[in-house]
Amino acid sequence: MSDNDTIVAQATPPGRGGVGILRISGFKAREVAETVLGKLPKPRYADYLPFKDADGSVLDQGIALWFPGPNSFTGEDVLELQGHGGPVILDLLLKRILTIPGLRIARPGEFSERAFLNDKLDLAQAEAIADLIDASSEQAARSALNSLQGAFSARVNHLVEALTHLRIYVEAAIDFPDEEIDFLSDGKIEAQLNDVIADLDAVRAEARQGSLLREGMKVVIAGRPNAGKSSLLNALAGREAAIVTDIAGTTRDVLREHIHIDGMPLHIIDTAGLREASDEVERIGIERAWQEIEQADRVLFMVDGTTTDAVDPAEIWPEFIARLPAKLPITVVRNKADITGETLGISEVNGHALIRLSARTGEGVDVLRNHLKQSMGFDTNMEGGFLARRRHLQALEQAAEHLQQGKAQLLGAWAGELLAEELRLAQQNLSEITGEFTSDDLLGRIFSSFCIGK
């Protein structure tokens, strides 16, 4: 398998449909056109033609589009054949194309990978293609489109350019130490560095919003049996997703629901009631519950308000709180307010949010929804926002750390060489986002998650 091969793949979803598209990219795309169509279509014009088999018989007829490189998606010669969407027809046409020497089936994401390697897209834009396809809400789709059009990349490139200018200034101060002006201590470098840090902080904040839009927030509902966990899942989901009975231990396994709160994706996970297991099935369910808790972004600690007046989680169930990961945020949910007569709403107890509601009637659930949105810092007015992945957040965080370390070196010891190195590392972290600096292993992991025809 060679990256110089001409590749072909179905660009439409598998199965039956009105239209099925095969995409070909590479130097032999011209030969495919002349062999299957009998001619080379006019560039960037739709041409209605028969698609012919090796013996001259017609396999299908449809629209052919010819995009000679480098003015194509991949930067190579690209041919698209748009025929009928029956799987048998598409399979026959694909087999016909593969009889031409030098043609092979594309790897997942290989069209986008070639576009990246031929400088038609940077890495963040290429990832945005997959994110746009996978978008689960209108806001996520709009943000992914902004990323595809270069909004995220432009912000990153602006930071890289600012760091480049700052590095030039610092390197000059190091290379010409005998000048009358001490460039390292005259305040200009510190001011420029502070500007870059402020700009980076703004991008990080937007990237966290973009990551939340893409990844969603994982919220686990946990507590003792019969506290109303499944009722809360149903209330948040707006449907009967879980079986609810008065029998303790009804939920034996993990239940998942994907919902949106004002555009914010939320993965709600209902778990088995935590107690000493009465049988092997329940024991496995409780083990899975703890696995989900340890991976959560937030835990909703469900408390049956009819069993205790306590509001401090450490007082309600100290063993449960002691087992939780140290930095895991907790929201205490006192349920069954319709029975206890407690006042609905939100308050704070020892650094934890406390919400009183009734999962059965739905009273107070809107307060919980708003709390979840606010606890993640989600902004519903993300005009011009962009999507971001975890690797982007990690690169931005690492760049911020290097800038802070560089600032400490500058102010603490006027150590120009150490500052220059921290600036270089920060610039390298940022360049990983757009692919200016990256590894083949990273590229392989990114593009392997794409659709075959992309």
UniProtKB/Swiss-Prot annotation:
Q: Which cofactor does it need?
A: K(+)
> Where in the cell is the protein located?
Cytoplasm
Record-level GO cellular component terms: cytosol
Name the residues that bind Mg(2+): 230, 251
Q: What class of enzyme is it?
A: hydrolase
What InterPro entries does the record point to?
Answer: G_TrmE (IPR031168), GTP-bd (IPR006073), GTP-bd_TrmE_N (IPR018948), GTPase_MnmE (IPR004520), MnmE_dom2 (IPR027368), MnmE_helical (IPR025867), P-loop_NTPase (IPR027417), Small_GTP-bd (IPR005225)
The record, for CDD domains, names:
trmE, TrmE_N
Which positions bind (6S)-5-formyl-5,6,7,8-tetrahydrofolate?
23, 80, 120, 454
Which E.C. number(s) belong to this protein?
3.6.-.-
Q: What is this protein called?
A: tRNA modification GTPase MnmE
Q: Which gene encodes it?
A: mnmE
